[in-house]
Amino acid sequence: AFKVKLLTPDGPKEFECPDDVYILDQAEELGIELPYSCRAGSCSSCAGKLVEGDLDQSDQSFLDDEQIEEGWVLTCAAYPRSDVVIETHKEEELTG
């Protein structure tokens, strides 16, 4: 498992996430409230920004390659591939 640190409006939340569990699912298991809608990687409700680390987001279909390179992440379809730090609640910034 990897360490996940979420920078939320309520302050930082840290937890361990296995590499085969989506970050959103693991956060919910632990009672951390995060925004989501489709849970399938095809909308922007759960969008966040990767501050550091590596993710596998191959299951998502909403973000384009450029957005992924810029660090955008859909927490409902992201597996950790290293320890990660993610800013959450970023949908407005992504969709403007």
Swiss-Prot record:
GO MF term list: 2 iron, 2 sulfur cluster binding; electron transfer activity; metal ion binding
Keywords: 2Fe-2S, Chloroplast, Electron transport, Iron, Iron-sulfur, Metal-binding, Plastid, Transport
Residue ranges of every copy of the 2Fe-2S ferredoxin-type domain listed in the record: 2-92
Keyword tRNA processing recorded: no
Subcellular location: Plastid, Chloroplast
Major subcellular location class: plastid
GO biological process: electron transport chain
Cofactor: [2Fe-2S] cluster
Keyword Transmembrane helix: no
Annotated binding of [2Fe-2S] cluster, by residue: C38, C43, C46, C76
One Gene Ontology cellular component annotation held by this UniProt entry: chloroplast stroma
The organism's place on the tree of life at top rank: Eukaryota
InterPro entries: 2Fe-2S_ferredoxin-like_sf, 2Fe-2S_ferredoxin-type, 2Fe2S_fd_BS, Beta-grasp_dom_sf, Fd_pln
Cofactor stoichiometry and binding remark: Binds 1 [2Fe-2S] cluster.
Gene3D superfamilies in alphabetical order: 3.10.20.30
UniProt family annotation: Belongs to the 2Fe2S plant-type ferredoxin family.
Role summary: Ferredoxins are iron-sulfur proteins that transfer electrons in a wide variety of metabolic reactions.
PANTHER family, A to Z: FERREDOXIN (PTHR43112), FERREDOXIN-2, CHLOROPLASTIC (PTHR43112:SF3)
Name this polypeptide is given: Ferredoxin
Organism (species): Leucaena leucocephala (White popinac)
